[in-house]
Regions:
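Function-dense linear segments that define catalytic or interfacial modules
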Residues: 1-103, 108, 113-119, 123, ...
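Glycine-rich phosphate/pyrophosphate-binding beta-alpha loops
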Residues: 204, 215-220
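Internal maturation/activation junctions in enzymes
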Residues: 53-100, 104, 126-206
């Protein structure tokens, strides 16, 4: 647990555990986009393309944090110019200062997936079967490895999140498990440069987004194929 980043609550849907004043930032990758020869016996999942997309998405999410901070600065400037007395505005100013500080110190992201149920169907795998469970585990492995590897690359380019401390997290079961899967030069870069984001991934219900992608939501199966 990093200083100032204890878990105190979640976002409304519960997929991201948040520290005080932290933000819920979500982005989803549509898994159906990576199925080759969908609905056929030779259907496959393009893990290489998926991994590259995850890396780009993680980089985009980090850019979004900078945009968030920029907008917070604009809001604070607007509040400063408001005609109300300083004593009245102070509560709001303190709130935005705390939100800004949390954004800068942790740079939390919530990268996930949607369309898992449809992806499995397109591959000819029954939801809940041993084969589908193995495929799902591989998808999440690629999501985590590529997301955290890109976060290391971003730390090399832009700097680690300020609260990062290698001594505190080098034996963390989750983080060390991911780092152990990386190539040696990435492990060395991690120890030297750290990570850009305090946390990277999550699994959201994805209800609204999946209406746009016209896929099953998040990791859920199709509940009914047709309605009357």
């Amino acid at each position: 647990e990093s200083v100032g980043f204890g878990s105190t609550s979640t976002n409304p849907c519960g997929e991201i555990i948040l520290s005080p004043y932290d933000s819920c930032r979500l982005m989803l990758v549509n898994l159906t986009s990576f199925v080759k020869n969908a609905w056929k016996d030779n259907a496959t999942f393009d893990f290489g393309k998926f991994g590259l997309t995850v890396r780009k998405a993680q980089r985009l999410m980090d850019d979004m944090i900078d945009l968030e901070i920029e907008q917070i600065d604009k809001i604070m400037h607007k509040v400063e110019l408001d005609p109300e007395p300083d004593a009245v505005k102070q509560i709001e100013m303190d709130l935005w200062k705390n939100i800004r500080k949390a954004a800068i110190n942790g740079r939390r992201t919530g990268l996930g997936i949607t369309g898992l149920g449809d992806m499995l169907a397109m591959l000819g795998q029954r939801y809940g079967s041993d084969e589908s469970i193995y495929t799902t585990e591989e998808v999440y492995k690629w999501l985590s490895l590529n997301s955290y590897e890109e976060s290391i690359q971003l730390a090399k380019e832009r700097g680690a999140f300020p609260a990062w401390d290698h001594k505190k997290e080098k034996d963390h079961p989750f983080i060390s498990g991911i780092i152990s899967e990386l190539l040696e030069h990435r492990k060395e870069e991690y120890a030297r440069y750290g990570r850009r984001n305090i946390a990277n991934t999550t699994t959201a219900p994805a209800g609204s987004v999946s209406v746009l992608t016209q896929t099953t939501s998040g990791i859920e199966p199709s509940f009914m194929l047709h309605y009357t």
